[in-house]
Amino acid sequence: MKILAAVSMAQLIVHVATARKAIRDQVPYDTPFGHGKPENVARDMWNPTLGSGMAAPWPWLAAQAVGTLALFGKAPSWVGKAMGLLGCSYIYGYLSERSVRASFRHPDMKTTPLTVLGTILSIAMALSGLARRERPSGTR
């Protein structure tokens, strides 16, 4: 679980950096299911279903932070699975955002590294959380 914890921590750091950039540059969420307004980005980050055009909302990041801290300790196995599912939702979120897809098509040095790294770490988080084998009781 320590590898998952480290990947999740790195992903959380990238997410906070992209959230900061999205708020500063007023990048609203823009998915096939809805569109935000640039002036509402900071407010939308507090809505658990919205977020910004570059980051998940604060409640999701708070849940990830709690799960990550639990993984560094003795967490039940369901925490790893939950973090894997969170990684899957981040993959979907990243790829559904117009600003992220645009940064892949037209790379720039400020946005693309964050979006690529966030997507890769989300994939790693999903794989390491969901591909874990359960150990039989009494074994190390």
Predicted regions and their residues:
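Short amphipathic, positively biased membrane-proximal segments
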Residues: 1-140
